[in-house]
Each structure stands twice: as structure tokens, then as C-alpha cells.
A protein has these predicted regions:
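Catalytic-core segments of class I nucleotidyltransferases/pyrophosphorylases
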Residues: 50-51, 58, 64-71, 84-87, ...
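Residue-level signal for inorganic ion chemistry
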Residues: 10, 41, 56, 70, ...
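Conserved N-terminal catalytic core of the sugar/cofactor nucleotidyltransferase
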Residues: 1-54, 60-65, 130-133, 166, ...
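A structural micro-motif
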Residues: 21-23, 48, 75-76, 150-152
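A short, conserved acidic/glycine-rich loop-to-beta-strand motif
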Residues: 73-83
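Short, hinge-like loop/turn segments at secondary-structure boundaries
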Residues: 16-20, 44, 69-71, 94-100, ...
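Conserved beta-strand termini and adjacent loop/short-helix elements that scaffold enzyme active sites
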Residues: 2-4, 26-28, 80, 155-157, ...
Length: 197
């Protein structure tokens, strides 16, 4: 886990509710951007490919299907995308034939595609060689757009994308989370181990 602001609260919660795994944390003392945080955490990454998830959003998908898709495509990078979102402040992803990513624009002024970046990525370790040589940088603005020349694919999911990046969206998501008609994959953990929100 890469943590920053309020990182102690996140580390404490996962320390108490870790289940059958040992969580590892990299605390960023200063903002590094999404890319800088991933680059700093790479010293702990042992798998190839490796999974990156945004911590302020939730989009349900089957990680095994994502991995099979990534492997079948021989992808260097795979991004989960959804059309089940009406917000304008998400990354816009254009897919071509065979789900190849043709463009990725973070929060464009004018949206010309229906696919939204779901904040879930699967990367081959070789992508690390493309990381910018700076301490603070954006995965969405500086790495993903340049990957369009690589085997970079979009994994389409019909799942809704929930963002808790603003106080208003957090309030909305808390209501959705409490709705018994909405199922989340972590609901049983939520009920057994206490509130995540």
C-alpha cells in the first residue's frame, strides 16, 4: 500500500483487519503524484505483471479475468475502463479494434469517448523503464498517454465506478454502501470487521 495524507489511519485499519496476508506500506511524506507513489513502491513489488489500484475509487471487476485478458493480449499494460459513469472529470480512454488503447486523456475539457478510466491497471515490469526521471509525476498524465505506442489494452467492465475523491462523493458513496440492494465484493469483510468508511 502506498499511503500519504492520513496514512497512519489507513495503516492502522489494515494492520487490525489484515486477514491472511501481511500488508506492506510505503508512506509518502510529501505528495509524489500517482506515478511518483507507484515508482517509490516498486522496491516492494515482486510480481510480474503487477496490479495498481486507485485508493479513492471502487469499480467491481474479476481480477482473474483481468489477468487472463492481459496475458492473452500479451499486453505491456492493461487499463480497466467503464461506460457506466456520467461524470466528466475522469480520464477519457479511446479504444480501437481488439480493445487496443488509442488514446488516454486525463480529465479532458471536452469528452469525445464514452470510456472512463476506472483507476485499475495491470502493468508488465518492463513499464518501469518508461517512468519519468522525476520525483513527483502523474501516472495518468505522463505515463499512460505514452503507452499508446505499446501493447496497451482496455479491459471493458459494465460495473459502476464509485469515486470518493470529494466530500460530496464520499457522502453519496456512504449511502450507496448502506443500500442492501447494491452488492460489493468486500461487503462480507465490511460486515465482519467493521466499517471501511
Amino acid at each position: 500500500f502506498s499511503t500519504g495524507y492520513k496514512g497512519d489511519m489507513i495503516e492502522d485499519w489494515f494492520g487490525r483487519h489484515r486477514g491472511g496476508y501481511e500488508p506492506l506500506f510505503v508512506r509518502d511524506r510529501a505528495p509524489l503524484g500517482t506515478g511518483g507513489a507507484v515508482a517509490r513502491a516498486m522496491k516492494l513489488v515482486r510480481s510480474n505483471p503487477f496490479l495498481v489500484l486507485n485508493g479513492d475509487s471502487l469499480c467491481e471487476l474479476d481480477p482473474e479475468r483481468l489477468l487472463r485478458f492481459h496475458t492473452r493480449k500479451r499486453a505491456r499494460a492493461t487499463i480497466a475502463v467503464t461506460q457506466a459513469d456520467s461524470r466528466e472529470d475522469t480520464g477519457a480512454v479511446t479504444l480501437g479494434e481488439d480493445d487496443r488503447v488509442l488514446s488516454m486523456v486525463e480529465k479532458p475539457r471536452t469528452r469525445t469517448t464514452g470510456y472512463h478510466n476506472a483507476g485499475i491497471y495491470l502493468f508488465d515490469r518492463t513499464v518501469e523503464a518508461l517512468f519519468p526521471n522525476s520525483r513527483s509525476w502523474s501516472l495518468e498524465r505522463e505515463l499512460l498517454p505514452q503507452l499508446v505506442t505499446e501493447p496497451f489494452y482496455g479491459f471493458v467492465t459494465a460495473s459502476a465506478l464509485y469515486d470518493i475523491g470529494t466530500p460530496e462523493r464520499l457522502v453519496h458513496f456512504r449511502e450507496v454502501w448502506k443500500d442492501p440492494s447494491v452488492h460489493f465484493p468486500v461487503t462480507s469483510m465490511h460486515q465482519e470487521q467493521g466499517s471501511l468508511l
